[in-house]
Regions:
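Flavin-dependent oxidoreductase catalytic cores
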Residues: 1-231
Length: 231
């Protein structure tokens, strides 16, 4: 799958209507759904959340959750829809998401993450990927990030969408977490250098695809977020 240009998952933004519009503007873009919790898929009519029938672009379904069995079940449901990839959210820092023990807080529990992903991969008909931050709170973005990525790579995860900031889980709301923690693009570039066999797609603060494509030519793709609708 071509991930050179991706539109990030954004709550209350990347619904199927917005994705349809993005598809009109660019046939090359890889699109993401909003994050959908596994329980929402499992306890309702799946098509209410997963219908993607009018989207021609490659589309990634992003799922949230921390229960391996629930994530496995949601992945099974997703197989009947035309998604190119299933992505586990490991980067959302909101307090509501934290209280449900999913999103960025899971970066503190690599063993649980591995269990979740292993169950998803057992049933997924397409690739399973992750979206991460450089770390959370006082996470060591050199040693701990490398260890985290290495652990997931060892179980078969090959694609990492990396928001080039840490997530601060206390004291900042999601909007502040998109702007206050400093960007560290060099750390993402180093991650690719150290794990050259993995697909590394960079996200965070990117508002010009052409300049980013040049700056990050050694990476496997560019992901834009707010720049997709703030113009």
């Amino acid at each position: 799958m071509n991930r050179s240009f991706c539109v990030a998952p954004m709550m209350r933004r990347t619904d199927r209507h917005f994705r349809y519009l993005c598809g009109i503007l660019s046939k090359e873009a890889t699109l993401f759904t909003e994050m959908i919790h596994a329980n929402a898929i499992n306890r309702n009519r799946p098509e209410a959340f997963l219908d993607n029938s009018n989207i021609l672009n490659p589309t990634v379904l992003q799922i949230g959750g921390s229960c391996p069995e629930e994530l496995k079940k949601a992945t099974t449901e997703a197989n009947q829809f035309n998604y190119s990839e299933i992505n586990l959210n490991l980067g959302c820092p909101s307090s509501k998401v934290q209280s449900g023990n999913f999103g960025a807080i899971l970066m503190k529990d690599v063993n649980l993450v591995k269990k979740c992903l292993s169950e998803m991969m057992k049933v997924a008909k397409n690739e399973v990927s992750v979206k991460i931050r450089l770390g959370v709170d006082d996470f060591n973005i050199k040693e701990e990030l490398d260890s985290f990525v290495e652990n997931l790579s060892a179980i078969g995860i090959n694609t990492f969408y990396v928001h080039a900031r840490i997530a601060l889980l206390k004291g900042l709301d999601p909007k502040q977490n998109r702007t206050i923690p400093p960007l560290n693009y060099e750390r993402v570039l180093k991650l690719k250098k150290d794990f050259n066999h993995l697909n590394i797609i960079i996200n965070g603060g990117i508002d010009n695809f052409l300049s980013a494509k040049h700056e990050f030519k050694n990476l496997d793709g560019i992901m834009i977020g707010r720049a997709a609708y703030e113009f």
